[in-house]
Amino acid sequence: MNKRNIENTRNALLQAAEKLMTEYDDPSKITARMLTKEAGVNLAMINYCFGSRESLLFEVFDKLQAEAMNSSPAFRKILEDDTSPKEKLVEIYFHSMKLMLDNYNLVRSVTKYVLMNRELSAKRGSLKFIQAHFKERKTESECRLIAYELASLHELAVLRHEEIKNVCGIDLKNDDELRYYIRKHIDMYLD
């Protein structure tokens, strides 16, 4: 298969996954057969192009999340103003977690996949703010690990938000409590 055909197949699968993810509340119900039928491609092409169904769904979710966050004027304003890197991280995680909590059925299975399969070397949007905060007091590797740990911690909290509410009394669906939770963890990592 030539490079152009692979790219066309990849794009068809991404479009099919995006369409199905907006139609279904639970991505775990979206089968590989449904995806390839919608895309009009061979079943084996999901693994060939993405490695797995979950990886395909994650790529679509990541794109949708970035579009949603970038379309928020309040979020864009925070990233562009002179707020400290630490405060920008609070807002990044606040908007990201809020979006995930508001779309919990959509993100549940994708987030489980991400937690178990994301590579430590994966580019994290928070990395540049962590590096700016530490101003060379920590190496890039140390900052990358902090970005990975913060992202994983917050993604796990989204998955376990009901138990966190029941056991710890912190309602992550409440904006003030969500900000408190995020700020507490960022303060622990960004000493």
Model features per residue range: what roles?
Residues 73-106, 140, 147:
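Hydrophobic alpha-helical connector segments
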Residues 131-140, 153, 157-191:
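C-terminal peripheral helix-coil segments that are non-catalytic and often amphipathic
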Residues 10-15, 28, 49-73:
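An amphipathic alpha-helix adjacent to DNA-recognition modules
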Residues 39-50:
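Short hydrophobic/aromatic patch on the recognition helix
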Residues 1-25, 29, 34-38, 55:
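Basic, helix-initiating cap at the start of DNA-binding domains
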